[in-house]
Regions:
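Short, Gly/Pro- and small/polar-rich lid/capping loops
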Residues: 5-67
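Extended Lys/Arg-rich, glycine-bearing segments that form polyanion-binding/interaction patches
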Residues: 14, 40, 107-111, 115-233
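Short acidic-glycine loop/turn motifs at beta-strand connectors
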Residues: 55-62, 95-100, 107, 163, ...
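Conserved phosphate/anionic-ligand binding catalytic regions in large, soluble enzymes, centered on
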Residues: 78-92
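Short, well-structured beta-strand/strand-turn elements
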Residues: 238, 294-302
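Glycine- and Gly-Pro-enriched alpha-helical subdomains that act as flexible
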Residues: 247-274
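Feature representing long, continuous alpha-helical segments
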Residues: 285-289
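Conserved small/polar residues in nucleotide/adenosyl-binding loops
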Residues: 303-309
């Protein structure tokens, strides 16, 4: 059951220089159906009515940018991303504000990290302003999907993948940049409460010179077996160790690690330093900035698992 179609219009926005943003008519679910889904959205289960799509072709650049209906993608079976994992993604959130507006949290940092990840995988980076335009356009179009309940947000997932139909091992010549959104409750089923962690000694997440500091799809596929081990051991998350000595904690399966030593005004924030093998998290960076602004000592260093266990 849907409401009437959104008005068809020619957007005055441009995705990037010379590339207009086309806004299509999008069927929208009824207010009643949307409200029912927002009562208990979970994480990553439901998706908004729209999505953003732009295409890239070598020699032509980014083109065909549009807001369209959320729908399955049509891809060639030989699309390079399906075979060689030339794919990156980001994750950020939009929050309902008391005055009825919607705010995204530090999207410019996601845009910069997304571009850096693209360059690491030999992909054409999405211009940072274009990334922000795409995110803003989707949130504006689907703002009715931003939940207002406690601990609820609109999770936004931009991603880029190699779409060229070609089986040779080289950087693709064609790409898709897509942004989708999903109303979300707490990431963990128990909500915002302490989680139990499992120290992985059998597997590593990333090695020096690899892709550990970018959000590429292959990093997460390779982490799933260790995550299964953690769940089998009754834990919520994996803690990864460094690849060389397997004694320094780096990060968890879905987030960076921080340790608070001491309490009160004397509390110190300790977090593993960015060695190129762990993700430079935006929440991590925000916590460091806030802690320093509050007068706390912040230390970034190689931190052993023995020290973390004390």
């Amino acid at each position: 059951m849907t409401d009437t179609l959104a008005d068809s219009r020619t957007s005055s926005r441009f995705f990037t220089e010379g590339v207009p943003l086309v806004v299509e008519d999008v069927p929208r679910r009824s207010a009643a159906e949307r409200a029912q889904l927002l009562e208990d959205p979970g994480f990553g289960r439901y998706f908004t009515d729209s999505m953003f799509v732009a295409r890239y072709r070598a020699g032509e650049g980014w083109h065909d940018a549009r807001l369209t209906s959320y729908a399955p993608l049509q891809m060639d079976p030989s699309a390079a991303a399906l075979h060689y994992a030339q794919s990156i993604f980001e994750g950020l959130k939009a929050y309902a504000q008391p005055d009825g507006s919607v705010a995204t949290f530090r999207p410019e940092a996601n845009a910069a990290r997304f571009a850096r990840g693209a360059r690491r995988l030999a992909m054409p980076p999405v211009p940072e302003e274009a990334f922000l335009t795409a995110v803003d356009a989707l949130v504006d179009a689907d703002r009715d999907w931003v939940p207002t309940g406690p601990d609820q947000t609109l999770y936004i997932r931009p991603y880029q993948l190699a779409s060229e139909p070609f089986l040779g091992v080289r950087p693709a010549h064609e790409y898709l940049f897509i942004v989708i959104a999903s109303p979300a409750g707490a990431y963990f089923s128990r909500g915002v409460h302490p989680v139990s962690v499992y120290l992985s000694e059998d597997y590593i997440r990333a090695a020096p010179g690899g892709t550990g500091d970018v959000k590429c799809a292959g990093n997460y596929a390779a982490s799933l077996l260790a995550q299964e081990q953690a769940i089998a051991a009754g834990c919520d998350q994996v803690v990864w160790l460094d690849a060389l000595e397997k004694k320094y904690v780096e990060e968890m399966g879905g987030m960076n690690l921080c340790f608070v030593l001491g309490s009160g005004d004397d509390a110190e924030l300790v977090t593993p330093e960015l060695t190129g093998t762990l993700l430079p998290g935006i929440t991590r960076d925000s916590l460091i900035e806030v802690a320093r602004a509050m007068g706390h000592t912040v230390t970034c260093l190689l931190y052993t698992s023995d020290a973390a266990d004390e």
